[in-house]
């Protein structure tokens, strides 16, 4: 009985930790002067996307779905 209780507590704690750290980071796809998204490859951390995101006023971005995604980029800052 004690092992079951301990196991249940551990499962609950890991569930709570996962929900805290699993939160989505807000952001946007930046747009160029033609209202197009910036295409990119390879996926993941991408120096080109980081540079584009810095141009749009945020510190970090990456290549997601072959388009640059900038973390914490607000709607008002999408177009450069």
Swiss-Prot record:
Disulfide bonds: 40-63, 49-68, 53-70
InterPro entries hit by this protein: LCN-type_CS_alpha_beta_dom, Scorpion_toxin-like_sf, Scorpion_toxinL/defensin
Domain LCN-type CS-alpha/beta, first and last residues per copy: 25-80
Keywords recorded for this protein, A-Z: Disulfide bond, Ion channel impairing toxin, Neurotoxin, Secreted, Signal, Toxin
Signal sequence, start to end: 1-22
Cellular component terms (Gene Ontology): extracellular region
CDD domains hit by this protein: neurotoxins_LC_scorpion
MF-aspect GO terms: ion channel inhibitor activity; sodium channel inhibitor activity; toxin activity
Main location, first listed in the record: secreted
Entry's family note: Belongs to the long (3 C-C) scorpion toxin superfamily.
Domain notes: Has the structural arrangement of an alpha-helix connected to antiparallel beta-sheets by disulfide bonds (CS-alpha/beta).
Protein name, entry field: Toxin-like peptide AaF1CA26
The species this protein was found in: Androctonus australis (Sahara scorpion)
Gene that produces this protein: aaF1CA26
């Amino acid at each position: 009985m004690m092992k079951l209780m301990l196991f249940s507590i551990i499962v609950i704690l890991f569930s709570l930790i996962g929900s805290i750290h699993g939160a989505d980071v807000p952001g946007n796809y930046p747009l160029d002067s033609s209202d197009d998204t910036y295409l990119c490859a390879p996926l993941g951390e991408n120096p080109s996307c980081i540079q584009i995101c810095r141009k749009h006023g945020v510190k970090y971005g990456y290549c997601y779905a072959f388009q640059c995604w900038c973390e914490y980029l607000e709607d008002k800052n999408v177009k450069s």
